[in-house]
């Protein structure tokens, strides 16, 4: 049976677990008898191996398994009897002094902390707001037009003109070039190409290369020096100066589609109505703005909660979360196609600060939800699923997809709980509204 629970620190505890030897031995005997029915030993048929021989060969292994099971069961019983909220897994060590009739082990573990959340009225939150008008719609249309850009040979007449009298390469043109690069008069890997296309001004090439191509006409060439940056991805040439010769093969000027009925149809407006197109773009932008403002204000609320909360964080939970973050990082590498990603040597220490924040925040949120009844209701979950599904072509299929998988539904439930917490805190905290542009909102949410 358990002795008195000892306090070893703020959260660390120790308790003695005692297991009667006769109880342990009975379980060992029972398992060996069961094992004897299936164990295979050369010279004996299955089930015919003498019990004594099975015991001699497997007693140590079986004893270790029985002790492990019994210790775990007894610790669970003790923790419930003592109302211990155990955080993480306990460690067990045999006591130096053992009784004749019992095995004794010290169980060392951590308990969940007491969470003290300060007065929410003292929490300060800055809430970003934005409005969607014609300027935001026009900027979005510009982006959509650029995504549908097509090119025409500069100087050649076509349905959209010839691109102007000046046939030299300009920023925005798509050019096709041959180039040869050498370092100390020796060609290097990746330094030579034929019929290589790129768009001037997009920054795909190094600045010196783009500058050299600007102003060239078809058939012209230019020789220039280019110093590779010290941190260039090609280690063999990083920090070195190469001499390039570039020859212009083709110059194509960009033509953006007109904003007309055909353009609207390409965006899914079946009748090509431009008013409907702008209304749909506005609706999508408002939905995106809402999502981004919610994300930013959620982070603001979480930061505010951490500032007014007091608690100690169990090391065991931090270590567990570090391992989760390591596995998430490996999965991300695997999705990017990195070879042997599942065995990537990612040190858990690099996630220590992030894990501590996540665990601390989880404990604070759990306390706030429990104390104020902020659990997610089924109708709230369904409303969020429906809202999310609106942005897809077949909303009903998206709803079915969510409700067919418990993990996805659990993720949405967690989102709803967080939203409940945010709304609850905003209703009590000092909230300052700040109007920001949609572009600033996008930038802020990307950094959050």
Curated annotation (Swiss-Prot):
Domain called PPIase FKBP-type: residue spans = 172-257
Quote the catalytic activity from the record. Answer: [protein]-peptidylproline (omega=180) = [protein]-peptidylproline (omega=0)
Q: Could you tell me which InterPro entries the record lists for this protein?
A: PPIase_dom_sf, PPIase_FKBP_dom, Trig_fac, Trigger_fac_C, Trigger_fac_C_sf, Trigger_fac_ribosome-bd_bac, Trigger_fac_ribosome-bd_sf, Trigger_fact/SurA_dom_sf
What biological-process terms (Gene Ontology) are attached? 'de novo' cotranslational protein folding; cell division; chaperone-mediated protein folding; protein transport; protein unfolding
Coarsely, its chief localization is: cytoplasm
What cellular component GO annotations does this protein have? cytoplasm
The EC class name is isomerase
* Cellular compartment(s): Cytoplasm
Per its record, what are the GO molecular function terms? peptidyl-prolyl cis-trans isomerase activity; protein folding chaperone; ribosome binding
Its Enzyme Commission number(s) read: 5.2.1.8
* Signal peptide annotation: none
Keyword Cell cycle part of the UniProt annotation: yes
Q: Which domain of life is it from?
A: Bacteria
Could you list this entry's UniProt keywords, alphabetically sorted.
Cell cycle, Cell division, Chaperone, Cytoplasm, Isomerase, Rotamase
Q: Does the keyword Ribonucleoprotein apply?
A: no
Q: What is known of its domains?
A: Consists of 3 domains; the N-terminus binds the ribosome, the middle domain has PPIase activity, while the C-terminus has intrinsic chaperone activity on its own.
Query: What the protein does?
Result: Involved in protein export. Acts as a chaperone by maintaining the newly synthesized protein in an open conformation. Functions as a peptidyl-prolyl cis-trans isomerase.
Family that this chain belongs to: Belongs to the FKBP-type PPIase family. Tig subfamily.
This chain belongs to the protein called Trigger factor
Organism per entry:
Burkholderia orbicola (strain MC0-3)
């Amino acid at each position: 049976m358990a002795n008195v629970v000892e306090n070893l620190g703020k959260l660390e505890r120790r308790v003695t677990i005692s297991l009667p030897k006769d109880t342990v031995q009975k379980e060992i005997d029972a398992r060996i008898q069961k094992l004897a029915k299936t164990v295979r030993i050369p010279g004996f048929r299955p089930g015919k191996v003498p019990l004594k021989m099975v015991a001699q060969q497997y007693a140590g292994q079986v004893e270790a398994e029985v002790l492990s099971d019994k210790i775990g069961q007894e610790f669970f019983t003790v923790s419930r009897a003592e109302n211990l909220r155990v955080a993480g897994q306990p460690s067990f060590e045999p006591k130096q002094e053992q009784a004749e009739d019992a095995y004794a082990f010290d169980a060392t573990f951590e308990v969940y902390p007491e969470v003290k959340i300060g007065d929410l009225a003292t929490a300060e939150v800055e809430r970003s707001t934005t409005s969607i008008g014609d300027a935001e719609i026009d900027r979005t249309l510009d982006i959509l037009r650029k995504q549908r850009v097509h090119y025409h040979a500069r100087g050649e007449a076509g349905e959209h003109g010839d691109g102007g009298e000046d046939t030299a390469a300009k920023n925005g043109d798509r050019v096709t070039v041959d180039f040869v690069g050498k370092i100390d008069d020796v060609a290097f890997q990746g330094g030579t190409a034929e019929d290589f296309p790129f768009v001037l001004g997009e920054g795909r090439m190094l600045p010196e290369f783009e500058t050299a191509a600007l102003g060239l006409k078809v058939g012209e060439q230019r020789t220039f020096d280019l110093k590779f940056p010290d941190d260039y991805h090609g280690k063999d040439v990083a920090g070195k100066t190469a001499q390039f010769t570039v020859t212009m093969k083709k110059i194509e000027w960009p033509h953006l589609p007109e904003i007309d009925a055909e353009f609207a149809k390409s965006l899914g407006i079946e009748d090509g109505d431009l008013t409907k197109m702008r209304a749909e773009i506005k609706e999508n932008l408002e939905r995106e703005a809402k999502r981004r403002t919610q994300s930013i204000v959620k982070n603001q609320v979480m930061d505010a909660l951490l500032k007014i909360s007091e608690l100690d964080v169990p090391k065991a939970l931090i270590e567990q979360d570090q391992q989760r973050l390591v596995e998430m990082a490996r999965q991300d590498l695997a999705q990017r196609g990195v070879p042997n990603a599942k065995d990537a040597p990612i040190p858990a220490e690099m996630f220590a600060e992030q894990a501590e924040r996540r665990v601390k925040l989880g404990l604070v949120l759990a306390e706030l939800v429990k104390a104020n009844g902020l659990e997610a209701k089924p109708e709230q979950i369904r409303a969020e699923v429906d809202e999310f599904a609106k942005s897809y072509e077949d909303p009903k299929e998206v709803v079915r997809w969510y409700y067919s998988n418990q993990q996805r539904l659990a993720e949405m439930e967690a989102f709803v709980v967080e939203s409940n917490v945010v709304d609850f805190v905003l209703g009590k905290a000092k909230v300052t509204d700040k109007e920001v542009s949609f572009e600033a909102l996008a930038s802020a949410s990307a950094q959050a």
